[in-house]
Amino acid sequence: MQGLGNNAFCIIMNIEEFREYCLSLPKVTEDMPFDENVLVFRLHGKIFACVAMDNPDLATMKCDPEKAIELREQYSSIEGAFHWNKKFWNQVWFNQDADDKLIRSLVDHAYDEVYKKLPKRLK
């Protein structure tokens, strides 16, 4: 970050790091239920995030509806998810104004959104 100024931040998130972070969470599995292009991450069978292999600069994540709107207003890299219910799903572009810390927190939030709706026996 040398020479970038005081307000600069380094963004390094990519599809591999996103995958590794998702899989680091407890009881997360991955599969490709739609086709060989879309990798989804699940907690007890429930999807909380996904990435498309042919668009590796973008991830889709579950989100609380109110928070989803706030994030879209605050960050140009966060939009309602294409082909998903935009009320509950955001898509986040890597290497724009959402830094790695924010993206990891959004993965955690997506995971928590699924976790809180699991039956007690699965928690």
Roles of regions detected by a PLM:
Residues 2-123:
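Charge-dense, helix-prone N-terminal extensions
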